[in-house]
Amino acid sequence: MLFRSPERLKAIPSWEFHRLGIEEQRARTLHTAARYASYIDRTRDLDGPSAREALMRLPGIGIWTAAVTVGVSHGDPDALPVGDFHVKNTVAWALTGRPRGTDEEMLTTLAVYAGHRWRVVRLLERAGFMAPRFAPKRRLLDVASL
């Protein structure tokens, strides 16, 4: 399935996303992004923090989605995805030696890198830092089989 235009994406019913393993909430977010495509396109001329703020005005787009999107699309060096389970644990493991951390601890730990926190996280990930796992990997449910 190719999404060549926002119009094409808007026309896809949510159950079609199930075949791709995309659950309803994410399908709604994709539809929202397609509906506001021209608004999103205008964020390309904004700096990173302003673009993140603009994206978070859209329904279904929170701090995590805005940070990851702008970190990639704008190269925003400080777009830290707060709320991500793995990122906070990667930071805790790599920089403090503790296998688990909280978002607040991550923000405190990365404060010395203000302005470059996304870069630091990406460097840690690329360097192979990964917090230890304590449970079996969660089984992904194929929503198409429901």
Feature locations, PLM:
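HhH-family (HhH-GPD) DNA N-glycosylase catalytic core used in base-excision repair
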Residues: 1-146
